[in-house]
Amino acid sequence: MSFTRRRFLQTSSAVAAGAAGSQLLGIRSPFAQDTMSFTPEDGAELRLLRWSKFVQGDETLWMENTKKFTEATGVPVRVDNESWEDVRPKAAVAANVGSGPDIILGWFDDPHQYPDKLVPLTDLAEYLGGKYGGWYDAAKRYGTKDGEWIGLPLGASGARMVYRQKWVQDAGYEEFPTDYQEVLKISKKLKEQGHPMGMALGHAVGDANGWLHTILWGFGGKMVDENNEVVLDSPETVGALEYVKELYENFIPGTLSWLDPNNNKVFLAGELGATANGISVWYAAKNSDDPKLQEMAEDIYHAGMPVGPVGQPTELHLFTQAMVFGYTKYPNAAKEYLRFMWEKEQYEPWQFAATGYISHPLAAYADNKVWTEIPKSMPYRDCVKNMLWNGYSGDLGPASAATMADYIVVDMFAQAASGERSPKDAAAYAARRAERSYR
């Protein structure tokens, strides 16, 4: 069975096209079959490397589904978990040396760093897209190169403003504001009340990349244009840096060194009024045995990421996708495992158990009951649908992956916020770093 394949234009209208447009790709083919399968090789066994959990329900259901797969196929699957920051370098090593896990759940555009080291997944991806309503635009951008699927998108750990409702109301707001200037105002009020904001400015692969790219694009700045020419050193970028520098003055101390776990810990310690994060903070409080944290959970709310001067959402979320490495002895078993895990019977219960921690890349899963039965998850539903991609508005490839892996945007904001460099110098220095990858 075969399956048919399917400018920030200098103004904010490009953001509307990129983010608000968020078309579905992989529209159902008239040839798509209800279920496809890959016959595992004799004696197949698999090893999967994935990022470590922030939500227990994610890991619990992932392992239960994996056990179901083994029972159905006889293929054992070993699952190893790594800290978020370690997944990318370990995947790169595996690709370079030609040995390691059969499957790795990587970040963002990792597959574009070593596409020739991966097993093509076009048949599987087109089947899933045809069966489950189509792939969102960002998912197809991340998963494909030259029309072929090199990764299989799992979704994104979405970022929303996570805040304490009472403290926000004490600051004079009914809910967390959605305008950049109002965010700056509330940050000052929360600091005055002793409940400051705090967002990661260290090498946090999810948190720092997410909110800082959102701010950069919200001011109209970007790494490259549609021709992949570096345009980071611009007045728009400087405006974004000046804004974050002022915002940082109202942050809790220590955010320059924060990694992904830090804001969770500080928030749950009762020290933060607001941060940008996934649903994991609320999940941890709600499911804690500590009555104080359970009480805190009632006061934790989620709001969409604020919109900047461009007037459209400009979000980046921690995108993750599966890669099957070319050195595997069992490519069919690997593809069958992924097919099984992405099917509705496994994916929806897993997403529900994780309370929507991973926003789906396939449109049909917008109907998962998690979004209505767990109302505090609803703000996370459309994260992948509405997100842009790192390297916007250029192409994904080795250059975009390298600049992301080197934290060029994050370092630029951290240098400007801390005063290590002026906003203008930070933008110029970051652009020079980026040009080494894009030349």
Model features per residue range: what roles?
Residues 36-37, 55-76, 409, 427:
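Short, polar/charged alpha-helical segment
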Residues 33-40, 107-160, 184, 211, ...:
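Hinge/lid segment of periplasmic solute-binding proteins
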Residues 40-41, 76-77, 169, 386-439:
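Conserved C-terminal helix/tail region of periplasmic/extracytoplasmic solute-binding proteins
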Residues 40, 109, 280-296, 308-408:
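C-terminal lobe and pocket-closing loops
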Residues 186-193, 227-256, 301:
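Glycine-centered hinge/linker elements that transmit conformational signals in sensory
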Residues 146-154, 159, 184-230, 236, ...:
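Extracytoplasmic/periplasmic solute-binding protein
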Residues 64-135, 144, 166-178, 266, ...:
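Extracytoplasmic "Venus flytrap"/periplasmic binding protein-like
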Residues 7-30:
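N-terminal export signals
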